[in-house]
């Protein structure tokens, strides 16, 4: 029987009850992580939970969990639900309290829920590439926090779906930031470009992996801003995330990127990613 982790206990889905006064439900007052499972093992799980606790700290949320404890509960959940290929979703909110914008006084216990799901890797997207669109970035100014406030991302993703695309690559003015659920990269003249780490983007775990792979393959990796025009005239474009892995974008706003085919550097990064899965899953 499927199990869900809820506030310190492993329960069945039918027993997983959340209050209507939970601040995650009322205000989006919380954080989350999404962790990939390959061959029954957790991929880059330490990095994910370090970011999870950083996000908690940034919003003044004391979870009373260590990285090691979070990894242990995740392992139990994967084993209980017999997940071979899939993911864990975990979120923490500021807890249950009467509706008031300010933090609850006195403090209440955070609410933590985690669950698993099985799903295949995106083989078709990885092999053949996807269509993308560009859209103005209308999100808040703390995109470095992996918060539950995802309305801007949802609207961007829906815009992509409306135009038969898989991802929406966002921009503030003419400066490309990131995808609605991914980091974005332009590859030009053998160099990988991606937006620098600051409050405008999430420091994606797969982004960190790609940077390490680029170093291993001696591919120049520059963390600097670039424009929408630069992106559209790149030799290759990719987006990356826990679920998307290293996905090539072969068409943007209806126009092909370069010759409309998956490029050689993308293939190198995908090759390196496969090796990274083997060496960084526990």
Swiss-Prot record:
Its EC number is 2.6.1.21. The keyword Transferase applies. Pyridoxal 5'-phosphate binds at residues 51, 178. PROSITE patterns: AA_TRANSFER_CLASS_4. It comes from the Bacteria. The active site is at residue 146. It catalyses: D-alanine + 2-oxoglutarate = D-glutamate + pyruvate. Substrate binds at residues 32, 99, 101. GO terms for cellular component: cytosol. The modification N6-(pyridoxal phosphate)lysine is found at residue 146. InterPro entries: Aminotrans_IV, Aminotrans_IV_CS, Aminotransferase-like, BCAT-like_C, BCAT-like_N, Class-IV_PLP-Dep_Aminotrnsfr, D_amino_transT. GO terms for molecular function: D-alanine-2-oxoglutarate aminotransferase activity; pyridoxal phosphate binding. PANTHER family: AMINO-ACID AMINOTRANSFERASE (PTHR42743), D-ALANINE AMINOTRANSFERASE (PTHR42743:SF10). Belongs to the class-IV pyridoxal-phosphate-dependent aminotransferase family. This is D-alanine aminotransferase. It comes from Staphylococcus aureus (strain Mu50 / ATCC 700699). The gene is dat.
């Amino acid at each position: 029987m499927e199990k869900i982790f809820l506030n310190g206990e492993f329960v069945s889905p039918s027993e997983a009850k959340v209050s209507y006064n939970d601040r995650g439900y009322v205000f989006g007052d919380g954080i989350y992580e999404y962790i990939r499972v390959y061959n029954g093992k957790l991929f880059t799980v330490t990095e994910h939970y370090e970011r999870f606790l950083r996000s908690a700290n940034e919003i003044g949320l004391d979870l009373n969990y260590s990285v090691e404890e979070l990894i242990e509960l995740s392992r139990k959940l994967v084993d209980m639900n017999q997940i071979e290929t899939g993911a864990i979703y975990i979120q923490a909110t500021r807890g249950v309290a009467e509706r008031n914008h300010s933090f609850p006084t006195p403090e209440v216990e955070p609410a933590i829920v985690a669950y698993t799901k099985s799903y295949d890797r995106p083989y078709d997207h990885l092999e053949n590439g996807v269509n993308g669109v560009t859209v103005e970035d209308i999100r808040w100014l703390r995109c470095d926090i992996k918060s539950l406030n995802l309305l801007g991302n949802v609207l961007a993703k829906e815009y992509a779906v409306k135009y038969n695309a898989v991802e929406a690559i966002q921009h503030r003015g003419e400066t490309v930031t990131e995808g609605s659920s991914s980091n974005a990269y332009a590859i030009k003249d053998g160099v990988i470009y991606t937006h620098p780490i600051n409050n405008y983007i999430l420091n994606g775990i797969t982004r960190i992996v790609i940077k390490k792979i680029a170093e291993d393959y001696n591919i120049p990796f520059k963390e600097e801003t670039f424009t929408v025009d630069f992106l559209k005239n790149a030799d290759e474009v990719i987006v990356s995330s826990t679920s998307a892995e290293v996905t090539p974008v072969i068409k943007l706003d209806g126009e092909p990127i370069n010759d409309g085919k998956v490029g050689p550097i993308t293939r190198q990064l995908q090759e390196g990613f496969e090796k990274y899965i083997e060496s960084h899953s526990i």
